Structures are given as structure tokens and as C-alpha cells.
């Protein structure tokens, strides 16, 4: 990675105190060096895409915002080769416990690891962001411009022109084929594009207090549903604890930040408030907003620039990383000429609906934890008492069965397009944002396969299909006998994975040409004891052993035995071994594939195991 004042390789150099204007050419310009912008830059960097990251601050933000990292986000860190560097700064299996009147009435503690990582993890965000930033040092074709403010930008039919100025008044003009606005909730890019950012702002604020030398020491995160002043107590890595207290009417940040008032806040939580080692405190407001579109021609929005949500489920950070995972490989294909830019339309199709669901999830968690009215508090308390007599309801809650998992019904998935229900009940549910109960019902109805989902939206013939969902990541054995996670075994690329049969048998020359253009691979999964037998494995097929029988169990639950995987590890399609060629052709259409010759395919090859997102 080039330093802030140095353009990408081959584009000339500039002294940090140079006073003459300069120009930089790139494939993609990213505005904002937060976690989403940095992750996209790493994904594109691994694909050889020329990237410029522009950040108005002179350094990466060093104070923590997010504290929760889920399994999907860790899988994306894995895909860019940075998961192992991040792990020392995480606490796996970080449960969330709700308490009322001193009693824990629910503990969210999912114990599955279907995507290869623990589902809930605490982490230190500034250290994660630094890992992403240092990860860019691997790429001579990625440059960063810290301390540069974007003054204006304009797009035309062939690209985007960006004018940025540093603290010395030196202007830099960037010309890029595409631009990504990852510049936060108050996004200059989104506001300049005049993209509506609809939603609501909670009336109450919260003060966040981070302390060193954890004065409590107990693990996990506790949400104390105290009617007088709800508060959060979260254990974080490296002896850090976070407290969050609701700001009551009439209180101000200035007053609460005084040492004596912070001591008063923590007095009921710690033994000695005078011995607390404070790091920092900040007051923030909960917002729930969603951009109407994520793409405007050659400019795309990601992360908080596209959606912001309350913190209660820790999904703001994770949703942004999902954006990066979805967008990165698509941008790489388009700028390399492998696909037409119609592929970028699928970014909004696939990500916006799930971002909306995560906003609803976060709001519902907030409704349970901190109702904004006396009536809401009473309803919450009655709901909690139901847990004692309805264990199935409690299990539904504590196992996070309510969490909407990404499911793409349109975009780069081989599913029949169908109209959604527009009946009276569906329209009523669409107005769920007008009350806590409505939001809860609306959230539960978003799972189409659930009873409530069927009542609201009608029977979903595709509810049980894995197509459009993230694929599992079990441990597998590779040819040298080592055991690795699935994504590390097959590389960061498209993959055709079959169970027990050669995925290339009967493949037409046209299908092979398409798959070669995509840089895809072929994978044969076997029961682990059979891995030593190679006579049934062609040279161009990767054989893997199913160490824990998870692949066998997965295929046993579906009617087809061949799965087409995208670089972000979502299932693009499924078929029988005799229909692979047809599925490949259909996938090429959904990808808006433009590569037509072997020569072009050579330039479009996707990186192996250390490479792109979620492979």
C-alpha cells in the first residue's frame, strides 16, 4: 500500500508538502477509510484492481464504536487473509444476557458454527480497522489519501471525477471507473447524490463509557432492563469494559461527562467508582435509516452511508462487512471486463432487503431492552414472564431463531422470479415501524418459512431451498492430509461442488469456457476415508474429505447433489450432475457475463485461497 501522499504504482509520485495539483487514475475510488471502505479495498486489492481510498481524517479512527462481530463477518476477514491477525483481539462465544430486577430472563448464546466461526464474538474495533488498513500494504496498486477532504465529484458515461484537498490546500484530482461512498451515516456522497435516507431517530440518547482494568471482570454482555435507567455492561478483550447508560430527559453530554457525574452513573454497578480507569465517553443517538437505492450509475453506497441501525444486536458493523463482501467481487468482475455493469444492479437487489431486516431486528431488541413508555415497559415485563411458562418461546429467543439470515430471492441466484404478496395483511405488516408490537410481528413474518411468514406472504415454494443462502463452511481434509476450513481449501472464486461424483462429467465445451472465464474451480467432496483413492478424480478437480460428515448431512437434506457457489460463498444454484451445463449457462446470464474468448478469460482469473471474499 502506498502512503497517504503517494499515488499508486505507475501513476507518478507526489511529495507530502507538494503545492502543485496532481492527478491519479484508478479503477475504483473509495470515499471513507472506515471498516467497510477498507474491507472493499482489501477485496479489490487481492483481485489486482487499482484502488484509491480517500479519507478526510488524518488517521484511522482510534476509538471503539462497534463491539460485536458475527460469524459471517469473520468469514469475510478469513477471505482476505486477515482472520488470524484479528483473532487475538476477539472473545468468541460472547453471549448477550437480558436481566430484569436482578434476574437473567434470557441469554442469547447460539452455539452453532455452520459458517466456520463462532456466531457471536466481542472485539476491539480500532484494532480490527488497523488490521484492515495494514492489510493494504500487500498491494502496490492500492493507495490511500488520508487527510483529504472530497470537495466535489461528478460522473459521466465512462467514469467518476473526484476533487479532493489536503490540509495544505493541495488539490488532487482522481479519475476512476467507479466510486464507492463508504463515508458514514452523514455521507457526503449520499447527500450529494440526493438519495433519500428514510427512517427514524430514537428520542433518547445514550452515553458510552469505556474503561480499562475491568472493574467487574465477569464475561459476556449484560443488558439490564432497569425501568429507572436501562444500562449495558459488556466485557471486551484486553481488560476493557463498556458501560452504556440511557440519557434521561434534561441531562446533557457536558454534564454527564464530568467526573463526579460519571462516578454517579457507575456507582450502582461497581464496588468503588473512584477507582475506575476511564478511557473515554461519548453520547450518541440511535438511528434507523435506509437509503432508497445503493447504486446511482457509477457510484455505489456501502455501510453506514447506505444504512444505519441501533446498536442492540451489534449488526451495524456486520451489515457493512456484508455489503463489502457482496460488492467487492462484482466490482472486480466489472472493472476487468468479465461482466457488464448490469451486474452491479444486483448489489441493491441483494443487500437492501437484508439491511432492512437487520434494522428491524435491532429496533425490536431495543424495544425489549429499553421501551420508551410506561405502557411499553409493562408489556415487555409481561412478555418476559411468558418465558417461564412457554419454554418454546424462550428457546426461539435465546437461540436467535428470529435473526433474519441473508436470503437472496433476486440477483445472481438461479431462482424463479415471483411476485410478492400485496394482500391486506402484508400491507399492514409493511407499516410495522409504527410501534414496538408491529415491529416484532413484522420481523417474525420476514422468515417466509415460518408460520407467521406463510400467513402474511402465502406459501413459499422456495422457502426450503439453499439457493440464495450462505453455504456452510465445515472442516475438510485436502490432498496433503491437512485439515482446513472449506473456503481455504477451494480458494476465493466461483466453485462447482459435488458430492461423491465428478462435477465435470458431461460438461459441454461452452460450459467449460464460461467457467474458465469466471476463473471457477471444480470440487469433489468425498467421505474422508475415500480421499486417498484418486482414480475417480480428474486432474482439474479438487478433492476434499468430509472430516465431520457435515457436507454429507447437508447434501442429505436437499434433493440435488451439485451446488454452484459464488465468490462470497452464497449458493447461486443447485442441480443434478446431468444438468450442470445448463445451470452454468443460466448463471452466466444472471452475471451479465461479457467474456467471450479464452484470451479475455485469462485476464479475469480470480485469486486462489488467499484471495477474494468468502472463498
UniProtKB/Swiss-Prot annotation:
It catalyses: 3-(3-hydroxyphenyl)propanoate + NADH + O2 + H(+) = 3-(2,3-dihydroxyphenyl)propanoate + NAD(+) + H2O; (2E)-3-(3-hydroxyphenyl)prop-2-enoate + NADH + O2 + H(+) = (2E)-3-(2,3-dihydroxyphenyl)prop-2-enoate + NAD(+) + H2O. It is an enzyme of class 1 (oxidoreductase). It comes from the Bacteria. Its EC number is 1.14.13.127. The keyword NAD applies. Catalyzes the insertion of one atom of molecular oxygen into position 2 of the phenyl ring of 3-(3-hydroxyphenyl)propionate (3-HPP) and hydroxycinnamic acid (3HCI). This is 3-(3-hydroxy-phenyl)propionate/3-hydroxycinnamic acid hydroxylase 1. It comes from Burkholderia vietnamiensis (strain G4 / LMG 22486).
